[in-house]
Amino acid sequence: MSSYNVPDLAPGEIHREEEVIRRSRFIVSMARVQGPDQAKAFIERIRVEHPDATHNCWAFQAGPAGSTAFAGCSDDGEPKGTAGRPMLTVLLHCGVGEIAAVVTRYFGGTLLGTGGGWFMPIKAW
């Protein structure tokens, strides 16, 4: 069983959580997706909702649980491998398939480092 709190989402439902970490505002948006096209459409929807965000990092696992056939991620300008890849790792190991997540960041003036774990305190995980 997963140690991550992944919500049980109905098709079309978006789950959101917000957290402030060292003055940066993070908004996690998650949704069920059926295939890469739906995942990309969801990611674009979140980008449009937050056009002035510093970053919209994302990851999706659009196939069955545990499959990497339809998976992808992006750091969206954060240092390479510090946001999208850790998010994808969480999605691949949470035991849930057909899910996409976007972490929207509004920079608060403090660099959080490149360890990739800065998002782990976010309640949606």
Regions found by a protein language model. Name each.
Residues M1, M30, M87, W118-M120:
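Detector for methionine-enriched segments
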Residues M1-T82:
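C-terminal regulatory domains involved in ligand/effector binding and gene-expression control
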Residues L9, L92-V96, T114, I122:
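Contiguous hydrophobic segments
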Residues D37-E44, T89, F119, K123:
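Solvent-exposed alpha-helical segments within well-ordered globular domains of core cellular machineries
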Residues H55, S74-T110:
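Conserved interaction-surface patches within small, structured recognition/assembly domains
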Residues A100-V103, T110-W125:
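Glycine- and Gly-Pro-enriched alpha-helical subdomains that act as flexible
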